[in-house]
Amino acid sequence: MSSSKPTIAFFGATGGSTISCLAPALKAGYRCAALARTPSRLRDLLVQRGVSESTIADNLTIVSGTATDLQPVKQTLQMGRPASDMADLIVSGIGGKLIMSNPLSPTLDNPTICQDVVRNILTAIRELRDTGTTKAPFLITLSTTGISEVKRDLPIAMMPMYHWMLKVPHDDKKVMERLIVDDAERDPAARALGGYVIVRPSLLTDGDRDKGGDLKKIRVGVEEAPAVGYTISREDVGRWVFEHLVKKGRESEYAGKAVTITY
C-alpha cells in the first residue's frame, strides 16, 4: 500500500452506504479502522462484497463498540492503536432505525443518534489533541435532502412524505450539520476538523450491488444549486463518496459544502 494514501476512520460501517465506501477503500489499499457493534457481521458483509480475508486482515482494524460511547470513538480515530496518530479522514454514515408503531408520529429508535455521534467525534478529536497530536481530520458525513434552508432540494411531490415520516430523523440531521458548520466557523486554532463535506443523498433505495452501475448517471449539486431527484441507491452513494471524496480528500471541489446527489 502506498504510504501517501490517507488513513480513514469509519462510523456506521455496516450501513449500506458506508460499507459501499469502505469495501472499495480496502480493495484499493487504504488503511482503515471501523467501529462496529458486531465485528463478525462487518467482516461477513465485506466478504460478501468481494473483499478478501487477507485484505481485511492487512488493511482493516475493527473496534468493537458503539459510536454513542466516547471511548470506542477515540479508539477508532486512533486506528485501533492507542499510540498512533489520528486518522486523516473520517467517513460517518450513522443513522437510526425508523419506528412506525405510531403511524401519526414516526420516530427513531434513538432520535438524536446523528448529532450524538458527531458530537462524540468532535469531543474525541479535541481530547486526543490534548495528548499532543496536531492533526485535524477531514470529515465526510452522510446527511439527507429535505432539510436545506437555502433552496428546495427534493421534488414537491415528496415533500408531504418527508415532512411527516422523516421529521424526527431530519431534525436530528439538522443539528448534526449545525455542529459541523459551527466547528468550521471557529477560529482555525480552535477547530476540531480540518474540513468537511456534507453529503445529502435523495431517498435511499437498496440497489443491486452486483451490477456496478455507471456513476455518471448520478447528478450532483450544491446547496445553492441542488440536484433535485427522487431516489439513489445506497450502493451508489458509497461508491460516489469513495470516488469523488475519499480519493480527493481535502482537495475535493466539494470541501466545505453540502452536496446533493441523486439520479
From Swiss-Prot:
Q: What class of enzyme is it?
A: oxidoreductase
Q: In which pathway does it act?
A: Secondary metabolite biosynthesis
In the record, the note on similarity to other proteins reads: Belongs to the avfA family.
Protein name in UniProt = Reductase pytE
What does the induction field say? Expression is positively regulated by the cluster-specific transcription factor pytR.
Q: What does this protein do?
A: Reductase; part of the gene cluster that mediates the biosynthesis of pyranterreones, a family of antioxidative compounds. The first step of pyranonigrins biosynthesis is performed by the hybrid PKS-NRPS synthetase pytA that condenses 4 malonyl-CoA units ato the acetyl starter unit by the modular PKS of pytA. The acyl chain is then connected to an L-serine through the amide bond by the modular NRPS of pytA. A tetramic acid is formed and released from the PKS-NRPS pytA to give pyranterreone 5 with the help of the thioesterase pytI.
User: How does gene deletion manifest?
Assistant: Abolishes the production of pyranterreone 4, but accumulates pyranterreone 3.
Question: From which source organism is this entry?
Answer: Aspergillus terreus
- Enumerate the InterPro entries for this protein: NAD(P)-bd_dom, NAD(P)-bd_dom_sf, Polyketide_Oxido-like
Keyword set, alphabetical order: Oxidoreductase
Q: What is its EC number?
A: 1.-.-.-
Where does the chain cross the membrane? none
Q: List the disulfide bonds.
A: none
What is the phylogenetic placement of the source species in the record?
Answer: Eukaryota, Fungi, Dikarya, Ascomycota, Pezizomycotina
Task: Tell me the Pfam families matching this sequence.
Answer: NAD_binding_10
What would be an example GO MF term here? riboflavin reductase (NADPH) activity
User: Does the keyword Phosphoprotein feature in the UniProt annotation?
Assistant: no
Gene that this sequence comes from: pytE
